[in-house]
Amino acid sequence: MNWANLLTSLNLASGTLAICLGDPYLGSLLIILGAIFDLFDGYVARLTKKDGPLGEQLDSLADVITFGVAPGVLYYHARPEELDPIFAAIVVIFLVAGTAWRLATFNVMPASAVFRGLPSPASGLFFASWLISIQYLESWFIGLHANPAIYLALPLIFAALMNIRAPFFSAKNFSRKGREALPYLTLIILTTLYIVTRPLEAGPLAIFTYILLSVIFFPRNQTTDPK
């Protein structure tokens, strides 16, 4: 066990505890905590030169739990009252399967400067921040979440986004300069604006913005898939 694998295990523990609690609010906070551990385990692995195949596999398995199963379970528990639980379960299965498929693809593809398909942590963070937002009456998203059609569509949309071949820019390349740095800077500026003006909706809005910027700044010169 090294420091990177310890952080990955804490990511896994966060997702598992979120599932055990079954509370959309507290569980979503644990998913966000897991995302923080997930962010740092890669940096620590590269810094300590401990980024071997075992750590990579462990990281993906942890991500399936924290960014696939946990958001799916919590989203299911937060379904609209008038919605048949069977339909909620079906779309959650698609979300979890889409996350697992995305991470399996991630593991077998060569390294790239961009992601092919929405990264699973972005999907997990969307649902975590969405579920936190709807706990507050003044949130924009309460009415949207209460709409069964929108509720059912969101997991299907994100399952598809994670597995399309379109590129999404990676935080690993934040050091780029000139026009290549524009999507990163735009995302930072707009996310800061969301936090200041609409803090309850900042998380989902930031993920939507990330998706939109990836489409606008489509890196057509990237032809390989990400690791």
Regions inferred by a protein language model and the residue ranges of each:
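Topogenic membrane-insertion module of multi-pass membrane proteins
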Residues: 1-39, 180, 191, 203-206, ...
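Multi-pass membrane catalytic core of lipid/isoprenoid biosynthesis enzymes
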Residues: 1-8, 47-105
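Hydrophobic alpha-helical transmembrane segments of polytopic
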Residues: 7, 27-34, 91-94, 98, ...
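Helical transmembrane-bundle signal
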Residues: 11, 15-18, 70-73, 95-102, ...
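Active-site His/Glu-centered metal-binding helix of metallohydrolases
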Residues: 13, 36-44, 61, 65
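Helix-coil boundary and interhelical linker segments in multi-pass alpha-helical membrane proteins
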Residues: 17-30, 69-91, 130-150, 196-201
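C-terminal ends of transmembrane helices
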Residues: 42-52, 98-117, 163-171, 215-223
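C-terminal membrane-associated helical module and adjoining short loops/tails
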Residues: 116-227
